[in-house]
């Protein structure tokens, strides 16, 4: 455990943050660099938090999460989402402080460069299916809508 969070969740979130960061660069139209602006940090933190809005109701329904004071959104308290937003922002801000600023980012094909972003775009849609199966309709609608938003945003940013 890291605090009250199982270590595997912390490790999986590092991957989600990485994919969300790639997606943030894709939809903002900002080139991927070794360091990034605070607007990218905020966007990435927001994207990860919205994904959590889709994922956490499933975890609660499966009995993997439980809070002493459950929230109104499928038992998930608001401070959970606020916490993930700020944890992501802090992690990325700390990375920016310690990152080597003169490391060139290798150029590679568009699809290789943004492969993590493409996976992130699909995750809310993938998570929406079990939401609908478990009658977590709001979470499912958010998942489908979020994927559609990310698809449209990524297409319009590359025009």
Language model segments and positions:
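Aromatic-rich, lipid-facing transmembrane alpha helices and their immediate juxtamembrane interface loops
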Residues: 1-159
